[in-house]
């Protein structure tokens, strides 16, 4: 009996210790300060904040929380591109929008490429963030904020700069694949690609301090062949 009590005491102390470490506040956004009762002995644990645009809040874009005060401008030195993963061909159109076409049920993988040219006086960003979102889904109950009836595996990311991609040797970039698939009821749609190039770290509970960033938006047209 004595040994069982000792074992139980060790387990309880271990859980308390782990939850004490987890419970440290790691929020940049005060509106996401929520606690949840853990299934283990009812001890509260804290959530770290997730992306706020249209997911946990009805914020229309990144600037609801972050400052648009970075040195990167919407000029030829800034790279925001979407490539066909197989051909590496840019899907950018003459009007500056992007066009992604695929058949119903067929998967299409693209590369999101973000960064800036090396041969200029503007420093490289440290971290790039991006989000593909259908603005019409913000404020609605749908869990997915991508175009309705389109499957997607990676609609958002926050990535350190330093990826290598043929054709972009003269730039500091991030590059990640995203696969989409129009389902049976999918229709043509227009979504928004929201991008931030950033340096520094945001201050806890105040995402407008400590981090500099430049915000950009691009229109992306999804076409069912």
Where do the PLM segments sit?
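Short, low-complexity, charge-dense intrinsically disordered segments
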Residues: 21, 31-36
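Intrinsically disordered, low-complexity segments enriched in polar/charged small residues
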Residues: 9, 34, 38-42
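Sequence context surrounding c-type heme c attachment/ligation sites in exported
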Residues: 19, 29, 41-225
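Positively charged n-region of N-terminal signal peptides that target proteins for export
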Residues: 1-4
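Bacterial N-terminal signal peptides
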Residues: 9-15
